[in-house]
Amino acid sequence: MIIGIGTDIVEIDRINKSIERTPNFINKLFTKKEIEYFISRKMRPEFIAGKFAAKESVAKALGTGFRKFGFRDIEIDKDELGKPLVHLSGGAKETANKFGDYKLHLSISHGRENAIAYAILEVDNNGNCNSSKDEGHR
């Protein structure tokens, strides 16, 4: 059963300007692994904006926004085929654990001007999710 959805759209230029104005912008919002990914992609702003939108959409799907945790408590990764995965820690994980065994689904895309992400938080009707714990959740 779907118990939360979230979507976010970000202007890539807005993210680019934030990076230019705030030297610590990347380090404040992204994990070491995410930053390594950005570096491997030559710090292209569309990838940064996509992960930013993904974190926002996950926070919305959890139903709290960022009131109980920070951006770095949500890490966006990908599997070997490029499918986006979500790894939660800290307050984000505590919030998600209240739902029991859960699964987060995530889609990220971008064009020239915008990046968008859509997240779904799923549990079964008993508050449990039957999927493996290695698929980008918990």
Curated annotation (Swiss-Prot):
Its EC number(s): 2.7.8.7
A Pfam family annotated for this UniProt entry: ACPS
SUPFAM superfamilies in alphabetical order: 4'-phosphopantetheinyl transferase (SSF56214)
Swiss-Prot/TrEMBL GO biological process terms: fatty acid biosynthetic process
UniProt keyword Lipid metabolism, yes or no: yes
Keywords: Cytoplasm, Fatty acid biosynthesis, Fatty acid metabolism, Lipid biosynthesis, Lipid metabolism, Magnesium, Metal-binding, Transferase
Catalytic activity entry: apo-[ACP] + CoA = holo-[ACP] + adenosine 3',5'-bisphosphate + H(+)
Key word Transferase present: yes
Origin: domain of life: Bacteria
Cofactor: Mg(2+)
Binding-site residues, Mg(2+): 8, 56
Localisation: Cytoplasm
Entry GO terms, CC: cytoplasm
InterPro entries: 4-PPantetheinyl_Trfase_dom (IPR008278), 4-PPantetheinyl_Trfase_dom_sf (IPR037143), ACPS (IPR002582), Ppantetheine-prot_Trfase_dom (IPR004568)
Example GO molecular function: magnesium ion binding
Enzyme class: transferase
Function per UniProt: Transfers the 4'-phosphopantetheine moiety from coenzyme A to a Ser of acyl-carrier-protein.
Similarity comment: family membership: Belongs to the P-Pant transferase superfamily. AcpS family.
Protein name as it appears in the record: Holo-[acyl-carrier-protein] synthase
Organism, scientific name: Clostridium novyi (strain NT)
Gene name of the encoded protein: acpS
